[in-house]
Amino acid sequence: DPPGGWPKAFTADVERVCEATCQLMGTSPPAGDRYQLVIQMLDSGYGGLEHDHSSVLQFSWSGLAKKDGYRQLLQLVGHEYLHQWNVRRLRPIEYRPYDYGRSVVSEGLWFAEGITSYFDLALPLIAGCSDRSMLLQDLGEELSRVLMTPGRRIQSLSDSAQEAWIKLYKSSVVSPDSQVSYYRLGAATAFCLDVRLRAVGSSLADLLRGLWQSHGRSGRGFHRRDLSAWLKPLEPRLATDLEHWLDQPDVLPLHDCLAMIGARLNPVPLQRPHHGLTLTDSNGRVVVRRAASDSPARTSGLVPGDELIAVDSRRLHSGVLPLPPLPPRPPFQPA
């Protein structure tokens, strides 16, 4: 148990999040009343693995101790619980049936994880465990992570999903410069879809429920064209735009969609110098491991593998690094 024990409302809040997920989908849980959540609390780690009638979650003690940690744990619960609809039963056509003996490529991973990631932000609010300001904060941070990933200019959402086996799950320190997560970019795409659908009197939840009725409930796999077929009667231009969002990098109209709901993202100035270097020790030598895109380090011509000899005539070695540490880039703030 965590120091001081679990929050008294934890079990009740988990139940409320599960009920909120059923409310979102408009149906009782397809797994019935025999669904098991296994939560493993670890020193470090975060994630979950969904099954037909259960899911295993991993969360860290340090994460739970953070200001927003409890809400993030409830979001993780909602994410995995929603997967009993979207993933376990409503699947891209390539996963009908699942083949656990090989890596199966599917662009539909963006829908499986991106849509779920978008809705998990709202489930604590729907459950009454959070408020709108917290949802706005979480959404701002999620969109910020996409905007601060240089790889979004290189890799499309469709490519990110299809290359998951060879890139996302074999990432390196330079991956952010050429790749983008289909979880995060998928969630940002879901946000844009939701805003555009709400502008014509519908919503992304309506789309998800519609696909559940037409495909998930009966075990039919869905294809990209099924999304277009659902969108065209409501907003023909949105169906075309979605094709563009999936196939082209860095075209998602995040700022326009935020403006449609009366919001914007304000960059927060860094409080310390930002050089953009990730350094490593190579037998006492100081070697560049990464020079972030658009950073002063990259602009000056530094690339991975370069050795830094001296700064201001001071010889560098691994024990003395007269460079300010690279601070985490702050998120944009919703306004």
Language-model regions: role of each:
Residues 90-98, 103-183, 213-218:
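Acidic/His/Gly-enriched intrinsically disordered linker/tail segments
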Residues 33-40, 136-140, 208-209:
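Acidic/histidine-enriched alpha-helical segments
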